[in-house]
From Swiss-Prot:
Its EC number is 5.6.2.1. The record marks 61, 168, 176, 312 as: Interaction with DNA. One of its GO terms (molecular function) is DNA topoisomerase type I (single strand cut, ATP-independent) activity. Keywords: DNA-binding, Isomerase, Magnesium, Metal-binding, Topoisomerase. This is DNA topoisomerase 3. Mg(2+) binds at residues 9, 105. Transmembrane segments: none annotated. Its cofactor is Mg(2+). The active site is at 310 (o-(5'-phospho-dna)-tyrosine intermediate). The gene is topB. It catalyses: ATP-independent breakage of single-stranded DNA, followed by passage and rejoining.
Length: 729
């Protein structure tokens, strides 16, 4: 009897699919049943070959050998996961296998994971596609009942290959050219370089900003009501101090007369459902989680706990076919503190509306929402619980009615000047009930603060107790943090000085810099390359980042190019552009970049040389700020030696509760805090043992410390090997 091989992206998903398909016979890297063989990748098992596989001369980095432009790029098996590749290959080549089912993540990168394996094996068997947004048993069963022909995703695969090959041609050539020309470990890319340029531009704005003092007037009545002055245009601020002084002097000892009471009933609707970027922004603002950390937590909630849908989505809407599943999802997530809210929604039929249901705004995947799967909070970590809470509350809020309130604006005259006061009466809490009325709109910046207004009629006279001048200073633009940088990458036109409407529309339609699936990795790479650094929550550009922008070709710094390329990749995915045409353009562009770098007469200056010498080659070490602390890195890119000097941990200072920094090596390591607190590692171990009731041994503490320095990386990404060899520092 013939069988079908199912290729999943990860072992955990493979196990779930195998259980549903009753594949319980364990083999070497696969699970088998009567009809199906389920095997798995580990992220990417296959990637584009290194330059040296085309010509041995590319083993050495020489400027004169550039650009490297092989006619066709070859595929190679990633060394670390070669064993699993062979396991998958042996199943694909079985004579009793007549069909392949691609069950990797439903998206461009997932398509690439499976198709590259199939291409490398040189297989010519029919392909079908499983395309699902959650990995619950129901979703898997429904997906297998509605398998799509593999040919329907050929263009998506072509687009994924085009993106990867473009990054190979441009990324590897530009990086080698910069590094060899300027004798420094420099790397650039079509997304990361414009991102660094935006950070630099924001720092320039801050540096050039000159604060101005502005003035206003506030009147206080005997009833402790605060009235705010407004000019004829409704402005409550003026840069003319003399004008404000004159008004204050003129109005002294005058009372206020109520000339108008404006009552308006208003509604505000819940913010939309989460896509990945919006969730990463909120998690950073509320909990300080990095974009990468949030994505990793979401992956666990999706794959391991199966309580949330596919995370790498760029849609904030659900499609109409999902509406019928909402009651089951509400029952599943409506436990514990969410029970009363879910119960309330289920009392009436759910009325879908365009604020959260829109087929035209859902492409590959709908918004992140709860699944119909059972929720076991005791299995969640604290971080998983917090991310789950964000998603469920937003899901419930969208299904609740609007927040309704009556806004009262009191307009008074003091002399011939206008003063106003505002108040709000809540008529119906609506969706804010889910947030216990604590949800605040970040965009509210009105000078006129809402207050509790006494009962007042038009024509009433209010005795003014005090009239005084107020003042403040204009603020410089805020530095980027991870939340605001994600916003900037999603909509870079807001941070660009461009009059080109077509360019702005292109960037908007292509989703900005990077994709929801890649932005977290891009930000992480910028930290690890020491092009940017964190100071507190703020992101600063480093000297290395500044110099890189001065050395790279101008076009690479602008989001324009990325926007145009993303548009073309989208056209390939839709079958409107041939991959070969795009790659030909990329090769020509690579030639231009390399030529420009070669002819540059600029120099790179290391301004972070330490007094330490490299233990491997004896050259000076560079002191850099990594994402998690200070590091020493060898100046020689060929050597690549690096070591940690200090790192920020999750251990908290017993005095001020801030995160402690771990400095030094071995038994001499010491915890240090900005408040001045110091503690030896051995003392910390003893204290932790006591705090845990003498249950923690030295091994537990070492495990805890190891966890602080652990980065949860994807199992493999397509350029892991290549990038490692490039020694991006």
């Amino acid at each position: 009897m013939s069988k079908s091989v199912v290729i999943a992206e990860k072992p955990s998903v493979a196990r779930d699919i195998a259980r549903v398909l009753k594949c319980d016979k364990k083999g070497n890297g696969y699970l088998e049943g009567s009809k199906y063989i389920v095997t798995w990748a580990l992220g990417h098992l296959v990637t584009l070959a290194d330059p040296e596989s085309y010509d041995v001369k590319y083993k050495k980095w020489n400027l004169e050998d550039l650009p490297m432009l092989p006619e066709r790029l070859k595929l190679t098996v990633i060394k670390q996961t070669g064993k699993q590749f062979n396991a998958v290959k042996s199943q694909l080549l079985r004579k009793d296998v007549n069909e392949i089912i691609v069950a990797t993540d439903a998206g461009r990168e997932g398509e690439l994971v499976a198709r590259w394996i199939i291409d490398k094996v040189k297989l010519n068997k029919p392909i079908k596609r499983l395309w699902i947004s959650s990995v619950t048993d129901k979703a898997i069963k429904d997906g297998f009942a509605n398998l799509k022909p593999g040919k329907a995703y050929d263009n998506l695969y072509a687009s994924a290959v085009a993106r990867s090959e473009a990054d190979w041609y441009i990324g590897l050539n530009a990086t080698r050219a910069l590094t060899t020309r300027f004798n420094a470990q420099l790397n650039c890319g079509r997304v990361q370089t414009p991102t660094v340029a935006m950070i630099a531009s924001r720092e320039d704005e801050i540096k050039n900003f000159k604060a101005q003092t502005y003035y206003g007037i506030e009147a206080q009545t005997m009833e402790k009501l605060k009235l705010t002055w407004q000019d004829a245009n409704g402005n409550s601020r003026s840069f003319n101090k003399e004008k404000i002084d004159g008004i204050v002097k003129r109005l002294d000892k005058q009372n206020a007369t109520v000339v108008e009471i404006d009552k308006k009933q208003k509604k505000s609707f819940s913010p939309g459902l989460y896509d990945l970027t919006e969730l990463q922004r909120d998690a950073n603002k509320k909990f300080g989680y990095s974009a990468k950390e949030t994505l990793n937590i979401m992956q666990k909630l999706y794959e391991q706990h199966k309580v949330l849908t596919y995370p790498r989505t760029d849609s904030r809407y659900i499609s109409s076919d999902i509406v019928g599943t909402l009651p089951e999802r509400l029952k599943a997530c409506g436990v514990g503190e969410y029970r009363p809210f879910a119960h309330k929604v289920l009392q009436k039929p759910i009325k879908p509306n365009k604020s959260f249901v829109d087929d035209s705004k859902v492409s590959d995947h709908h918004a992140i929402i709860p699944t119909e799967g059972y929720v076991n909070f005791s299995a969640f970590t604290d971080k998983e619980r917090k991310i789950y809470d964000l998603v469920v509350k937003r899901f419930l809020a969208v299904l609740f009615p609007a927040f309704e309130y009556e806004q009262l604006t009191l307009r008074t005259k003091v002399g011939n000047e206008t003063f106003i006061a505002r108040g709000k009466t809540i008529l119906h809490a609506g969706w804010k009930e889910v947030y216990e009325n604590r949800f605040e709109d970040d965009d509210v910046t009105d000078d006129v603060k809402e207050q509790l207004l006494p009962h007042i009629e038009k024509g009433d006279t209010l005795a003014v107790k005090l009239i005084m001048q107020t003042s403040g200073q204009t603020k410089a633009p805020a530095r980027f943090n991870e939340a605001t940088l994600l916003s900037a990458m999603e909509n870079p036109t807001k941070y660009m000085d461009t009059q080109n409407k077509q360019l702005a529309d292109t960037l908007k339609s292509t989703g900005g810099l990077g994709t929801v699936a890649t932005r977290a990795d891009i930000i992480d790479k910028l930290f690890n390359s020491f092009l940017i650094e964190k100071r507190g929550k703020d992101i600063h550009i480093t000297s290395k980042g500044r110099q890189l922008l001065d050395l790279v070709p101008e076009e690479l710094k602008s989001p324009t190019l990325t926007g145009e390329w993303e548009q073309k990749l989208e056209a390939i995915a839709k079958g409107k552009l041939k991959k070969e045409v795009f790659i030909s353009e990329m090769k020509n562009y690579t030639k231009e970049i390399v030529s420009e770098i070669k002819s540059s007469d600029k120099k790179y200056k290391h301004d972070n040389i330490s007094t330490k010498s490299c233990p491997d080659c004896g050259k000076p070490m560079l002191e850099v700020n990594g994402k998690k602390g200070k590091m020493l890195v060898c100046q020689d890119r060929e050597c690549g030696h690096r070591k940690n000097v200090s790192r920020t941990t999750n251990a908290r200072c017993p005095q001020c509760k801030k995160k402690l920094e771990l400095r030094g090596e071995g038994a001499g390591q010491i915890f240090a805090c900005k408040c001045g607190y110091r503690e030896k590692l051995s003392t910390f171990q003893e204290r932790r043992k006591k705090e845990s009731g003498n249950k923690a041994d030295k091994r537990d503490v070492q495990k805890y410390m190891k966890q602080q320095n652990k980065e949860e990386e994807p199992l493999n990404n397509p350029f892991a090997e290549a990038l490692k060899k490039l020694k991006f520092d």
